């Protein structure tokens, strides 16, 4: 079986409309949303990555505001979900197998050392040498 990359590839996946712990459910629901809103149609720019990055920055700002302003956790969680939906949509727009890339990246970061910086601990291959 080939991996699903495009919106149309995901539309045939049966999915639940309730949390079930499934990557397939999340991706197929986001693909259904992209299809419904016609994001890939010419002139809609819904798959234009410049536009999508701008939306991501906007949503990240909303998450930041919810946290820094001490809003209820439910509001921050909703903004976090907006970011996840956008990121999953980015993989559709770019026709990237995000699940595969996630596992490749996790394999890589698990080999890195944690480093403590001025603001806190992080895991990176960056070196200030």
What residue spans do the PLM features occupy?
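Flexible "arm" and connector segments at domain edges
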Residues: 1-80, 84-129
